[in-house]
From Swiss-Prot:
Residues 73-94 are annotated as: Disordered. The gene is large2-b. One of its GO terms (biological process) is protein O-linked mannosylation. Pathway: Protein modification; protein glycosylation. Its EC number is 2.4.-.-, 2.4.2.-, 2.4.1.-. This is Xylosyl- and glucuronyltransferase LARGE2s. Coiled coil: none annotated. Residues 107-382 are annotated as: Xylosyltransferase activity.
Length: 723
């Protein structure tokens, strides 16, 4: 057998040498007859240039064939040097013919994912797979309600080519395993991999199953190709456990579940689903679990204990994968025996409860590899590089609209970025949905990394629910996560929804952010604020009372919260309206933007507010942009407005067009805190082109408003012309 393998290796090496020589000779002939042929192609093609194109194409084909043969040769050499799969303890070399995965063969991967934290972890896993892959992928995600909401929206907005996602309801599978006591930190979800023959479609014959704490360092197609090595009764592909857990010698009186030798780790599994169904897998694992639980009482390592008990009884079911397909970084691991250099690593498994803080002499190397994908820009993975035809690719309306844009349009950048598809990760951190209350109100705001310091301040002023949209890069999202987890103030709050919108383009998509925060509020009313404003103490309860006093059957209302500002970074915050009026009189506070944009808030009628004791009505006026409390189902913000200029004005205009009644609250206020000018406001002030494009967008908005609301909207156009 070994001689046969070496003969095949020599044959492939000879083929590779001859192919390389033929390619070199072919290229040399082309250069001799037609001159240098691989330079840029001229605009006007001659017979010579056509030949150059053909020659270049054939050269690429030859290089691809060369690469494929090199890979196949390398695999055969690896098989000569390393033990093949089989039962535990089999170190003989099996020179089996291993066909490479077909170029466009669809690879199926199943992952159990539940909760907010697991939804973040699975993104890093998927990034590592997508980065290395050369094949189409179909992800089968078994999720709870939280992960379903988060991941469905994330993948819909990510729009990765040649990637299909299917979701399966974990709640429907829980009854199958709920009877099993489990001490593992994964809880009931750690047992659901046992149910995959039932959960996944009957047409699916094989699948790779992964834990969420996995990082790939190679193409997953290499793992998929190992299915072809299964023989006889083998239906499970697993890596041996790399700790002494199942040997029972970790501590005194340690009694693990039964296992074959060291046992096997289930962080990476190859499942032959069709064969498992034929042998009655569901009954097999259930009977085994019932038998062992009579003595063990509960599982310690969730599904892994039951898989190992089954394998102990039926060892012919398992194909042992090489250990580099699951390098385990558990607390008692011996995984360093699996690799001698970085090139040996294929899959890293962070299977310690301590995750990145696990003690391991090579942990810095592994952590660096993990952080590479954690902070990698996921938008780069949208690029189609594998060249496989795709069925049912996501081709949103925005893509069609983008293709219709005129690149000669002076405002092309504004139009293109308003149509950009941003990845959206809802509920980036765990939070609770508020208890239903007809008068409850959520503070809605958006921010970027440079405003992060405002979060703790706002939390001290507003005890109610918040929905915050954060515009971050992948790396900044991790900085925010560390900041939030280290903050006692933020950690003490369970009623704040943080929704990450990943950066794309140069302009700040302010109204997209507002809409994401607005749509993901879970109370009947919302307070549409900005991150630079501190609410008065007690504003949350004040607004709830004001809402309760409104007639819910009348016309829709927008309750205006008067806005003020200070130029002082250190401010003794007013505790009441009387304190605020005193500070207003002494010059410690001002009405908001009175010195640069007075008409933005002048219709609030601050003179009347000073003495008002009941809400009073004001009329809409051009450029009015107050901060308001409205029902959560109010009109969304117009996303054509990016950066600075008219993003709030347009929204108030739409509220007025829908006949919202504007009421100023007499005992409520917010104060704007000073900060350095944003990039967008600096651009607006310095660039005439920027201001001209904002004006163009304003005019188009007026036209759209007239089409939607007819003659009632003509007053806005008239008011604009009279300014």
């Amino acid at each position: 057998m070994l001689c046969s393998c070496r003969s095949k290796s020599k044959f492939l090496a000879l083929t590779l040498l001859l192919l390389s020589a033929a390619t070199w000779l072919y290229l040399s002939v082309g250069e001799t007859e037609y001159g240098p042929s691989l330079g840029p192609v001229a605009p006007h093609f001659s017979a010579t240039s056509l030949f150059q194109v053909e020659l270049e194409s054939r050269l690429r084909e030859a290089e691809e064939e060369n690469r494929r043969l090199r890979q196949q040769l390398g695999e055969i050499r690896n098989e000569e040097q390393s033990p093949g799969g089989g039962t535990e303890g089999d170190n003989s070399s099996h020179c089996e013919h291993r066909s490479l995965t077909e170029k466009c063969e669809l690879i199926h991967v199943a992952i159990v994912c539940a909760g907010h934290n697991s939804s973040r972890d699975v993104v890093t896993l998927v990034k590592s797979i997508l980065f290395h892959r050369r094949n189409p992928l179909h992800l089968h995600l078994i999720t709870d309600d939280v992960a379903l909401r988060v991941l469905r929206n994330l993948f819909n907005t990510w729009m990765v080519p040649s990637l299909t996602i299917s979701f399966y309801n974990a709640s429907e599978l829980k009854p199958d395993v709920a009877w099993i006591p489990n001490k593992h930190y994964s809880g009931i979800f750690g047992l659901l991999k046992l149910t995959l023959t039932k959960a996944l479609p009957s047409y699916l014959s094989k699948v790779i199953v992964l834990d969420t704490d996995i990082t790939f360092a190679t193409d997953i197609a290499e793992l998929w190709a190992i299915f072809k090595k299964f023989t006889g009764e083998q239906v499970l592909g697993l890596v041996e456990n790399q700790s002494d857990w199942y040997l029972g010698n970790l501590w005194k009186n340690h009694k693990p579940w039964p296992a074959l030798g060291r046992g096997f780790n289930t962080g990476v599994i190859l499942l032959l689903l069709d064969k498992l169904r034929l042998i009655g897998w569901e009954e097999m694992w259930r009977l085994t679990a019932e038998r062992e639980l009579m003595n063990m009482l509960s599982t310690s390592l969730a599904d892994q204990d039951i898989f190992n008990a089954v394998i102990k009884s039926s060892p012919t079911l398992v194909y042992q994968l090489p250990c580099y397909w699951n390098v385990q970084l558990s607390d008692h691991t011996r995984s360093e025996q699996c690799y001698s250099e970085l090139a040996d690593l294929k899959v890293i498994h962070w299977n310690s409860p301590h995750k990145l803080r696990v003690k391991n002499k090579h942990v810095e190397l592994f952590r660096t590899l993990y952080l590479t994908f954690l902070e990698y820009d996921g938008s780069l993975l949208r690029r189609e590089l594998i060249g496989c035809p795709s069925e049912g690719e996501q081709q949103g309306g925005s893509q069609a609209a983008l293709s219709q844009l005129d690149e000669e349009d002076p405002c092309y950048d504004f139009r293109r970025e308003s149509l950009a598809s941003h990845r959206v990760h809802l509920s980036f951190l765990p939070h609770l949905t508020p208890t239903p209350d007809p008068s409850d109100v959520t503070l809605v705001a958006q921010l970027s990394m440079d405003r992060l310091q405002m979060l703790e301040l706002i939390c001290r002023h507003w005890e109610g629910p918040m929905s915050l949209a954060l515009y971050l890069s992948d790396a900044e999202a991790q900085q925010f996560l560390r900041y939030a987890q280290a903050s006692e103030v933020l950690q003490s709050r369970t009623n704040i929804g943080y929704h990450v919108i990943y950066k794309e383009g140069q302009l700040y998509p302010v109204n997209l952010l507002r809409n994401v925060a607005l749509k993901n509020s879970h109370t009947p009313y919302v307070f549409l604020s900005d991150i630079d404003f501190l609410p008065m103490y007690g504003l949350y309860e004040n607004l709830r009372k004001s809402i309760a006093q409104q007639d819910p059957t009348g016309s829709p209302k927008a309750l205006i919260v008067p806005a003020f500002e200070t130029l002082r970074y250190r401010l003794s915050f007013p505790k009441s309206k009387a304190d605020l009026l005193s500070m207003l009189d002494t010059g410690a506070l001002y009405t908001f933007r009175y010195h640069v944009w007075e008409k933005g808030h002048a219709p609030t009628n601050y003179a009347k507010w000073r003495t008002a004791t009941t809400p009073y009505r004001v009329e809409w006026a051009p450029d009015f942009e107050p901060y308001v409390v409205v029902r959560q189902d109010c009109p969304e913000y117009d996303q054509r407005f990016l950066g600075f200029g008219w993003n709030k004005v347009s929204h108030i205009m739409e509220l007025d067009a829908q006949e919202y009644e504007l009421l100023v609250l007499p005992n409520a206020f917010i104060i704007h805190m000073p900060h350095a000018p944003s990039f967008d406001i600096s651009k607006f002030r310095s660039s005439e082109h920027y201001r001209r494009c904002v004006q163009v967008l304003k005019e188009e908005f007026h036209q759209d408003l007239s089409r939607r609301y007819g003659s009632a909207a003509l007053k806005y156009l008239a008011a604009e012309r009279n300014q």
